[in-house]
């Protein structure tokens, strides 16, 4: 696959920049409403030639729902496939990511997949550790190892902002506790979940996460297996079917790679055996995806022939 050049990335960014005007910030988490909606950055981390980047690629932003892929991998390592999927399903849903509907109407009552909020909360409740400090340190260690960036931390400001307004997520937790999906203290779980969502990265970090998943968990620079191959395959399957909220089907048609988005404006994607892509554009479309980020991935996929379909 031919290498993309930095000036090509810069041209594509300029081409899609007008789309940022059509999107809106995620103001329901107050701290996210302080982002600059015009920001747009991209990085591509290749297995051989390191990375190229353009735009606001070194601006820090929080993982938000992108963290769901990280904690799913950790939970599978900690608990194994059989236990994890006894509590959380494997099917996509057409409902909003924070909906409670399927929990009420599906029997047995369990979240349909790990990429919706109910499923992600259940996954976080499975992480090993004696307390939240140990669990959060494990999450940070995992992200630092995948990104090869020991400075990565979380934003307590964003975590607190999210914790104060997370009424719907609390209701999902109480409903799941009633039905035996989770058995931990709800406020403890909410504290950990909001911190995992508030882990800060930039596009280069995100692209490196994408590279590790593109290489089935193998780090071509450290020359070691970081995540077991079978776990990355499970994660990437969910990224294809559920990774882009209610646009996952359209994204599969228009872009056709495993990807996961977050409401802070991040998207990471992976091109199997080749590269990872990290994007930041906090102006979101109606489904909660970076509007310009979606467009630049669509253009790159068409140009480079990335689609797995």
Curated annotation (Swiss-Prot):
Alphabetized HAMAP family for the sequence: Glutaminase
Residue positions binding substrate: 65, 117, 162, 169, 193, 245, 263
InterPro entries: Beta-lactam/transpept-like, Glutaminase
Listed name of the protein: Glutaminase
GO biological process, one term: glutamate biosynthetic process
Oligomeric form and interacting partners: Homotetramer.
Gene this chain is encoded by: glsA
Domain of life, source organism: Bacteria
Homology family: Belongs to the glutaminase family.
Enzyme class, broadest EC rank: hydrolase
An example Gene Ontology molecular-function term: glutaminase activity
Keywords for this protein: Hydrolase
Reaction(s) the record says it catalyses: L-glutamine + H2O = L-glutamate + NH4(+)
Enzyme Commission no: 3.5.1.2
Species this protein is from: Bacillus cereus (strain 03BB102)
Family annotation (Pfam families): Glutaminase (PF04960)
